[in-house]
């Protein structure tokens, strides 16, 4: 079992901190009791990320023009697709609620509704544009690609579950990169730890990493940011 964290500048992709416990002392490399600590699970392992994917889904819905913060849907607490039933975390329905409440209360049925309004194929394409299922390009070894084959499925249930981070498995660094785009005007950046290369001769060279494109509009990004501030101000305080 691991615990870890990543702190990144969403506008540049510069990684300020990336750490995992348990770890090892690089000055005493051969003395680790468990060789598993030599792996970096933030780069090399994949996980079903769950509800932290919901802001991405909301951003997609805003960008596609199928919802606004005031758009309402009838939350019955469950939704059945392809013979499978998905439920809110507590199984309860909220009745007619706006999209702001989908984020405030982390409603699975709400983000599944957004995915259905966007359309399964288009929604899957959006998630791929966020870099989910591809390498981020981080300048660290052994990066693993996420498991996102479900985004090519003809079944609507796969996209509904993906909308709240289940059924697809992602590396933490790929997830952080995708979330960073939401705070960067919709622009995806390459995460990186290097800034400059210094040579023995005394010369140095700045290292640059490219932006990877606009995944949602700046307007959608700004609207989503206001919605997430609303979550903190009204639902968490």
Q: Language-model segments: what does each one mean?
A:
Residues 3-51, 56-237:
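Beta-lactam-recognizing serine transpeptidase/beta-lactamase-like catalytic domain environment
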